[in-house]
Amino acid sequence: MPREVYFYDPPDRFVAGTVGLPGRRTFFLQASKSGRTTSVALEKAQVSALAQRIDELLDEVVRRSGGTSDVPAVAPAELSDTAPLDAPIEEEFRVGTMALAWDADSERMVVEAQALVELDADSDEDLAAAEEALLQDDENGPPMLRVRLTGQMARAFAKRANDVVNAGRPPCPLCSLPLDPEGHVCPRQNGYRRGE
């Protein structure tokens, strides 16, 4: 079966969002354009890392351009998107590998999210070789979401992604673990009393 690539250049909308209550949220990347929507599931840590890396890459683009780039230092207010994910949310795949690149010729950020694939290998070297072969296989590789964004769109995506990650459960002031509405067993209190 040929590889499925969900390609948006540029999308009308590209956001990170969640479904569910804090502590039980499922995280998604969602791209849409002209009535077509693609949603892929991923972990909270992946959303956080993606937002951080996008900001770092954009900062580097601005630094190398000497300030002449169209990339803004902060997310433009007019691109702020706080709307929920577009319904219905149908997961195309769960993300395993992500990649970022900056296309200097078109001044676009390229975000790729590939499906999680389990590989059987006898050694670390075999596993590394199998992973590399799979990622380079343009015809039979895992499904992939590929999105090309302007610098402004990428900054807006990163801001929203950080906001979504930070909108979860507040941390315990003692141990920094997330607090559930009913509290939690705090290791810094020897697990005997519930943190508030």
What positions do the PLM features span?
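Mixed-charge, glycine-accented linear interaction segment located at domain edges/termini
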Residues: 113, 118-183
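N-terminal auxiliary interaction/assembly segments of multi-subunit proteins
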Residues: 59, 70-73, 159, 166
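The feature marks the first
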Residues: 1-60, 64
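Short Cys/His-rich local motifs and their 1-3 flanking residues in nucleic-acid-associated proteins
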Residues: 177, 188-191
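Short, structured motif recognition centered on aromatic/hydrophobic residues
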Residues: 25-30, 50, 54, 109-113, ...
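Short Cys/His-rich "knuckle" micro-motifs
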Residues: 181-185, 195-196
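Intrinsic, low-complexity N-terminal interaction/targeting segments
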Residues: 1-27, 68-137, 141-144
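Generic structural detector for well-ordered beta-strands
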Residues: 41, 101, 146-148
